[in-house]
Amino acid sequence: MRIIITGGGTGGHIYPALAFLKYLEKVEPDTEVLYIGTKKGLEAKIVPQAGIKLKTVDIQGLRRSLSPQNLKTAYKFFKSVSDAKKIMKEFKPDVVLGTGGYVAGPVVYAAAQLKIPTIIHEGNSFPGITNRFLAKKVDRIAVGFHAAEQYFPASKTTFTGNPRAQEVADAAAQVEKFEEPTVVIFGGSRGALKLNNAFIEALPELAQRSFKTVYASGEIYYDDYKETFNQYKENSNLDIRPYINNMTELLAKSQLFLGRSGSTTIAEVTALGLPAVYVPSPNVTADQQTKNAQEYVDQGAAIIIKDEDLTGQTLVEAISNILENNEKYQEMQAASLKAGVPDASQRLYNLVKEISK
């Protein structure tokens, strides 16, 4: 198979694509892969590091308000469509897969015009503007949240979950749990100021509880709190770090997650059957993180603390109410396991094969 994958800007569009490619390499080792992104997006760094060939087009996002910049965006869109067609005529893909982000717009659009089989993967519960635009033009639509199905034509939409779920589930298969109940608190790669402030407030209480806390402040914040953190460095209940490098292994060993509710994070957490306390970021388009988390609250696998309601007290209470209540913990764990999709890449692969024949 020859496949072009496109998607970028943020990790939520890129990591699922890379997870799928990892699976594809395993089931079809002879697959030829080309990734199309932008020079400015996160993909420009991450994709080559993964050993995948990258080509770029020059495109920018559409402003949601009236702006002269949108004229420039329109010009760049059609120029990128033309550039993408040239790349495809040279590469001759059997299928083109878009995982979201504005770069996927012109690339998948170009593929559809060339009558190349196309599929998009929507990772969030509320679709982004690019995938909403592409929905009528593609052959298949894969979604990572059941809530997203309502926004797309039912005849070509399939729930597959997020490919990161299968990557995490496979990697964690042989990992043993910590002996003591453990919660991982993580505000993302850069950290989250509101979460840090609540954690500092909660430290005296967390130091005395019956569970262990692993906390990552984010590297840019760590030095600001280092003096306070050092006061607790001998406390066996607390493991405080600037960043968590081995997140998959750590989550697999733990019993509970507390943090933001990006689509990839939720896929990883549910693939492992972990209950979760989500604190949706208020700085995300269309309040996507709240919508993402709500689907799993409705299924009994998680609870939400609004960012504005997050304090040291609400943080400790939320964790304690789950980890120190065995019946509730087991109910949430079962719900999380049921909601998880540990075969997400296989499901997406089945769709790809279906349209590339």
UniProtKB/Swiss-Prot annotation:
- Name the Enzyme Commission number(s) assigned to this protein: 2.4.1.227
Q: Which GO terms describe its biological process?
A: carbohydrate metabolic process; cell division; cell wall organization; lipid glycosylation; peptidoglycan biosynthetic process; regulation of cell shape
Q: Which UniProt keywords apply?
A: Cell cycle, Cell division, Cell membrane, Cell shape, Cell wall biogenesis/degradation, Glycosyltransferase, Membrane, Peptidoglycan synthesis, Transferase
Question: What job does this protein perform?
Answer: Cell wall formation. Catalyzes the transfer of a GlcNAc subunit on undecaprenyl-pyrophosphoryl-MurNAc-pentapeptide (lipid intermediate I) to form undecaprenyl-pyrophosphoryl-MurNAc-(pentapeptide)GlcNAc (lipid intermediate II).
Q: Where does UDP-N-acetyl-alpha-D-glucosamine bind?
A: 10-12, 124, 189, 244, 289
The protein's topology relative to the membrane is: Peripheral membrane protein
Q: Does the keyword Cell cycle apply?
A: yes
Source domain of life is: Bacteria
> Where does it live in the cell?
Cell membrane
| Gene Ontology CC terms, in alphabetical order | plasma membrane
GO MF terms listed in the record are: undecaprenyldiphospho-muramoylpentapeptide beta-N-acetylglucosaminyltransferase activity
| UniProt name for this protein | UDP-N-acetylglucosamine--N-acetylmuramyl-(pentapeptide) pyrophosphoryl-undecaprenol N-acetylglucosamine transferase
Q: Does the keyword Calcium apply?
A: no
Q: Which organism is it from?
A: Lactococcus lactis subsp. lactis (strain IL1403) (Streptococcus lactis)
One Pfam family, please name it: Glyco_transf_28
The protein's matches in InterPro entries, at most eight in alphabetical order, are given as: GlcNAc_MurG, Glyco_trans_28_C, GlycoTrans_28_N
Q: In which pathway does it act?
A: Cell wall biogenesis; peptidoglycan biosynthesis
Please give the family membership noted in the entry: Belongs to the glycosyltransferase 28 family. MurG subfamily.
Q: Which reaction does it catalyse?
A: Mur2Ac(oyl-L-Ala-gamma-D-Glu-L-Lys-D-Ala-D-Ala)-di-trans,octa-cis-undecaprenyl diphosphate + UDP-N-acetyl-alpha-D-glucosamine = beta-D-GlcNAc-(1->4)-Mur2Ac(oyl-L-Ala-gamma-D-Glu-L-Lys-D-Ala-D-Ala)-di-trans,octa-cis-undecaprenyl diphosphate + UDP + H(+)
